[in-house]
A protein has these predicted regions:
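PLP-dependent aminotransferase class I/II
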Residues: 6-8, 13-20, 26, 42, ...
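Active-site phosphate-binding strand-loop segment of PLP-dependent enzymes
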Residues: 1-67, 72-74, 79
Length: 191
């Protein structure tokens, strides 16, 4: 028995969950999905938190559901001991069976998160609409390669990251980014 953490939901695009879960089942692995950038992303019509043994989300200020700091773990496996971490490893009063940590969010960041839940779905739908526009227009540009979502996925589009083949363009990367910024499309070099 073991576990595997899947950290490939970068930019809000779900991975091929069917393939990962098949491998996990074959090797008797627990799967923990890192969905820090994938709030509201879906795979085969289900929210991504429905898959694996656990799913983690980040509420850092730059995320789609940012509260300043904090996060959340959803669990699909009753045997998974998330409660140990929440309660400092305490299973019974004064009985600690594992090392625990205090990662509780404070009331203020919790209230910010609850208030932002009201706008998360419409904001995600807006991101999806913008991503569709980007996809239709980027496909016509030689040398610019857009992200292609995994079959069956409905991304949350935390970021829309393109790969640019500078040899195919007649400008530098900085000139390309400046032209996009001038048109109201913010750009940045990440990672």
């Amino acid at each position: 028995d073991g576990s595997v953490e899947v950290r490939d939901r970068a930019r809000g695009i779900p991975v091929d969950i069917d393939a990962i879960e098949a491998i996990a089942k074959k090797h008797n692995l627990k799967v923990i999905y890192d969905s820090a950038q994938a709030h509201m992303a879906e795979y085969n019509g289900k929210g991504i938190g429905a898959f694996g043994d656990a799913c983690t989300y980040s509420f850092y200020a730059t995320k789609n559901l940012g509260t300043g700091e904090g996060g959340m773990v959803t669990v699909n496996n009753a045997d998974l001991a998330i409660g140990f971490l929440r309660s400092h490893g305490e299973t019974d009063k004064y009985l600690h069976e594992s090392i625990g940590f205090n990662y509780r969010m404070n009331d203020i960041t919790g209230a910010i998160g609850l208030s932002k839940l009201e706008t998360l779905k419409p904001e995600t739908n807006r991101r999806r609409a913008v991503a569709d526009i980007y996809a239709s227009r980027i496909d016509a540009i030689d040398g610019v390669h857009r992200p292609v979502p995994t079959k069956g996925s409905n991304p949350a589009w935390h970021l829309y990251t393109c790969r640019v083949d500078l040899d195919a363009l007649t400008c530098t990367r900085d000139e390309f980014c400046a032209a996009l910024n001038k048109e109201g499309v913010p750009t940045a070099v990440h990672y």
